A protein has these predicted regions:
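Anionic ligand-binding catalytic core segments
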Residues: 124, 130-133, 146-150, 314-323, ...
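A conserved helix-loop-beta module that forms one wall/lid of the active-site cleft
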Residues: 159-192
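Short, conserved helix/loop micro-motifs enriched in His/Cys and acidic residues
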Residues: 133-166, 247-261, 269
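Middle-to-C-terminal accessory/interaction subdomains
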Residues: 247-289, 293-295, 302-416
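Internal "kinase-insert"/substrate-recognition segments embedded within catalytic cores
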Residues: 177-180, 193-274, 356
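Structural recognition of the beta-strand scaffold that forms the well-ordered cores
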Residues: 121, 139-141, 153-156, 186, ...
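Regulatory N- and C-terminal appendages and interdomain linkers associated
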Residues: 2-120, 346-509
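Short, solvent-exposed loop/turn and secondary-structure capping segments
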Residues: 86-88, 197, 208-212, 288-294, ...
Length: 509
């Protein structure tokens, strides 16, 4: 090989230096023209495209190509029906909440990417919190003629959130759960492009059961402040009242909801534990959104199974009281421990990291600043580990009672908590005998052989268990420390200092 020293810039070098610039100009021109022709907020989109190109031309070009390959969904409706939806949305934005009314659904003609010709469909606004400004994209629900389930169209406003929604549903499917499909589409309404949307198709058209949230939405629309996200107004409801299995499905969820049956008797506790833990991994919330959660019902077994759906940004988790079943609580704790390990994220990357990356390009998240989206999942894992190993899992207080002492234990955990030992003065560690628990408090313990296990905190009302400790159990004296951990889960052991109302023993010189 011969290397020649160049006295100037050759023509080939000039061409190679010019090529990236030309590609960039071509990309920006195509990007800009596409949005000028099809996008509502084309100015903002074009500016975002320029910024994305400046950060990484290759990534921006890949994302643009991915978007050009997305299917198109077309909706055509009469002007009067459009105005009816527009008026309903304006009212919802003023109230901050929308309560669907049957008469506000309109008819439309819809063309799906995989269908030939148009199909008739109902179109409506979804119930719940009204999102966005007056000129922002609309969230819509549509139901093709003959279908039972409504499909949802959500504008992609937050690409990172959309990416997590897609990843959440895909992870559920890969772990054995039925889940909705989430497909990015380009939405055209009456010939005008509305931009990038997610089309959510429910997991099944068969009978489902969930909670009717209309009373909660109405209360929120009237200005009521609901710390529980409105769950106090929840009422079991079925998707198809004319289904022969509907009464049994409704009764099954209602029995668990009212506490007449243990939750683990109507659904698989271990599966529900995994479902809840995967929800926290992808959303950061401790449980699925109660208003959107649906369950399938098997008439042969009488069992319910949770169905995955895209979780909203303003998620209202099922309250902890709904999971007031030790079998379910421990299953959730075990799954939180398992899915919060760093190796689990590596497993996800290996199984479908390429698919997630492709969705990131299509949704636009790969072209936005903000770093690695996997970092959000890592943060969620830290929160999951903290949930099963908090700094203050219980309160412990000791006070004299004649010749003996009373130890009061109050669990602050949503999971059963095992008290594994008592350290006395850093010298002696001994187990707490369940027989020391006062007889009137033994109902607050779980039956566990040779173990002292406190029941989970009952909602926001902690319950206290009293133990009568003999004086010799605290010898030789000194500071007292309790050891505890979540029961029947591979969770780390925590330490809790015991508060003393009076010194136990006088210090000897």
């Amino acid at each position: 090989m011969r290397v020649q020293q160049s006295g100037g810039t050759s023509a080939s070098t000039a061409r190679s230096n010019t090529l990236p610039l030309l590609l960039g100009l071509i990309f920006l021109a195509a990007f800009g023209l596409g949005y000028l022709a099809q996008q509502q907020h084309w100015g903002e989109a074009l500016a975002a495209g320029v910024q994305a190109w400046a950060r990484s031309p290759k990534t921006a070009l890949t994302a643009w190509r991915a978007r050009q390959q997305l299917p198109t969904l077309t909706v055509d409706l009469r002007f009067a029906d459009y105005e009816r939806l527009s008026s309903a949305r304006e009212r919802a934005l003023q109230q901050g909440m929308y309560v669907p009314l049957p008469e506000e659904a309109v008819t439309a003609r819809v063309t799906f990417a995989d269908a030939r010709g148009q199909v008739a469909a109902e179109l409506r606004l979804p119930g719940g919190a009204a999102q966005g400004a007056a000129d922002a994209g609309w969230t819509l629900e549509l139901r093709p003629a003959g279908a039972r389930a409504w499909r949802r169209l959500t504008p992609v406003v937050d690409a990172a959130l959309a990416w997590r929604q897609w990843g959440y549903l895909e992870t559920l499917r890969r772990n054995g759960f039925a889940a909705a499909t989430l497909e990015p589409v380009r939405l055209i309404v009456n010939g005008s492009s509305w931009g990038l949307y997610l089309l959510e198709t429910p997991a099944t058209e068969a009978l489902t059961v969930g909670f009717d949230a209309r009373a909660a939405w109405q209360a929120l629309a009237e200005g009521e402040v609901l710390a529980d996200g409105g769950f106090r107004y929840a009422a079991p409801a079925v998707s198809a009242a004319d289904d022969p299995a509907a009464p049994a499905a409704w009764a099954t969820l209602d029995a668990a909801f009212e506490g007449e049956r243990a939750l683990s008797s109507v659904t698989d506790a271990e599966a529900l534990g995994r479902f809840v833990a995967l929800t926290m991994l992808w959303t950061g919330a401790p449980a699925p959104d109660w208003a959107s959660l649906r369950w399938s019902y098997d008439p042969a077994t009488g069992q319910l199974a949770p169905l995955g759906s895209a979780q909203p940004a303003d998620i209202a988790p099922l309250p902890e009281a709904f999971f007031d079943d030790p079998a379910v609580q421990t299953a959730i704790a075990r799954a939180l421990v398992a899915y919060s390990q760093p190796g689990f994220l590596e497993t996800l990357r290996g199984e479908f990291g390429a698919d997630l990356e492709a969705q990131g390009y299509a949704l636009g998240g790969a072209t936005q600043p903000g770093g690695d989206p996997w970092q959000v999942l890592t943060a969620h894992q830290r929160a999951m580990r903290a949930r099963v190993a908090p700094e203050h899992p219980l309160r412990a207080m000791l006070e004299p009672a004649g010749e003996d002492f009373v130890l009061r234990l109050t669990s602050l955990q949503p999971f059963p908590l095992e008290v594994t030992g008592l350290d006395v003065g850093g010298v002696t560690r001994r187990a707490l005998d369940p027989a020391w628990v006062r007889s009137q408090d033994r109902a607050l313990l779980l039956k566990a052989e040779n173990a002292l296990v406190l029941r989970a905190m009952d909602g926001e009302l902690p319950q206290t268990v009293e133990l009568l400790l003999p004086r010799e159990a605290l010898a030789p004296g000194g500071e007292l420390t309790l050891f505890c951990r979540v029961w029947d889960a591979d969770a780390p052991e925590g330490r809790v200092a015991v508060l003393e109302t009076l010194p136990l023993f006088e210090e000897t010189p």
